[in-house]
């Protein structure tokens, strides 16, 4: 590893030094190629060109150029390296640049060259002993925070961190300046204050500003680190306290030095990623697969990260989570043991004891190797000898590749139907067409590793022409009863699915979007345009093919997962898994949904699925209903004035007309005509939310153009919004939201707009501008005296307001933010643009963030293949 780093550093400084670090044989090969006049270099599996061979190819290209010829380099790969590879990815990009042509996996499937598939997710909770460890970890963290901040010095530090001065009414004062200086740290310090000094006056008032959520582990640890750096480290007499703090933080996975703190290997995330419960989940998955309509076709492989090593936290006794331990669990179950499983790693070959007498001879015949029962290694985990038999190779030159081919042959024969192994051996390069079920227990999430693993099941199987692959990911989630936050597993799931295509499962079964499902809205008249489905896959014959979790989790499943992660004890993993099981009822149905051999356009586009959460972010319910009440009162008041006039003058038609004219003049002078207009616009937005999402899309596009980001955008004339419908979560009906797409806009421009639209409806972070959705905005629309008066009264009676964040690209220039607000007011309703600058803007930002979290709005960008 050090030699590789040195070579890379030297060659980055001077490419001519490459020849000095390469072997003479490599230099001789380059000389022969250049002398032969080669100009075109074709590199298959080019994703391997990350280190040594990248240097060789780089030198070859330089030598070809030096000979007077411009080289042509063609790289072929099915798995691009990940940007997470850092310098290696930079080396690769330096050779090939951006991708010039890509054939998405769905196209290869539709052409009939790969098997159709479905990506599935199975959820589990940590094992009992791991839950004991996690509960203890949670308790220790709380005790640690209390010990650090319970004393007078800790309390003073927290109050100093939030800038607390006193209480003004029901709000703490002094916090605004600290929020402006460092919002994230100040919010974390305030959260710790609330949960460690709940009876302090500041702690009693802060929840109204920032909420009552517990601080995350990361944020709490960083507050502790700053306390140690500022209060303990400078005092030489507190050296022992400093070292004790360092040791404690190390136990939580953080390394504290005099230069700051850095995150290490988080023990909570390690336990979740390598939980023993995943082995039980793998067995459960096999059970359900065998019980499905296509159970007789199942040939499964369980892939683990390590053969014998793994997480030991939370395991007082017994083996660690590994491939060996997983195989022992498989053999202990009667159903999975009946599939005649084999464990195969680079160093291990295990079989079920009940199968040893016939599997070992079969492997010897297929591999040509001499095999024998192994008595075991004292360094290996202990196993139940009556269930598992270790096999050793007695041949002088054993080859893992030979054994892999032999085991693959048994899988193809159907003699062996379950294989357990490691990613290192069964990842890239392993070819067994009979395998149709992958159970991924690994912790990898990079693009290359994820696609390589799932590619193992996509080979066409001559013995099953209707083959459909099931690729399972197993995700361990924290039980709601444990307050520790651990989103690493969910983040890993999301990163994996961002790289994978699959059949969209978020639409109701049998739903076929029609022309009436679309809205055509334009920021200027555009005659002659008729709304049409964006692509052939929206015709209702086949589901959409998308990236992201939408091809693995139904809308109900996604809502239940969010509830589970938010600590709702009514949500359970069984509810999540029940949703998944509905997707594996018939592989034949999945085969039909892929439309093998059917025509397709081959285009890709982007859309965003948005949900307004509990309260739509495009109107302010308390203020709206207060304004309605005031309008009703105003009408009653005018009626009370006019009625005595009619009684006094009589009911002659002329006198009635005079009274009505008098009322109209009064209302006109006051500008009351605008009041029902504004209320009507808000009510219409509530009744037809699709128009609001559409208006937001136009507002974003106009804001991008005004911010000069639009130089790379086309003129936006129209867009379409496809409704999702509604789902039920528990006993509460929640809107599933809408999918916003731009089918007639070039993909690059559409992606820019879609990303910005998604940001509008995402939880608020720290934007430069906010949009306050009010009953009456500022100068974005003309106002009247009565309208301003009613708005003022309504907001005093019911001051609640909702906020949306102005997208970063739109808010880069103030002109873009102003145009966004102007378009919002024109197309959706009144609003007020708030610049998040200065201490006075921090309180609205805190209120906006709190309302956004409570509202539970969310959005996600997807890529759609047509």
Identify what each model region corresponds to:
Residues 48-114:
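Post-DEXD/H (motif II) to motif III coupling segment of the RecA-like Helicase ATP-binding lobe
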Residues 66-67, 446, 456-468, 501-506:
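Arginine/glycine-rich "motif VI" loop of SF2 helicases in the C-terminal RecA-like domain
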Residues 150-185, 189-191, 488-808:
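Long, largely alpha-helical accessory region at the distal end of helicase-like NTP-driven motors
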Residues 420, 430-443, 469-473:
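A short beta-strand element within the Helicase C-terminal
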Residues 1-3, 8-12, 32, 37, ...:
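Conserved C-terminal RecA-like helicase domain
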Residues 2-72:
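SF2 helicase catalytic motif II
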Residues 452, 456-490:
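Conserved segment of the helicase C-terminal RecA-like domain
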Residues 47-51, 81-82, 309, 425-428, ...:
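Residues immediately C-terminal
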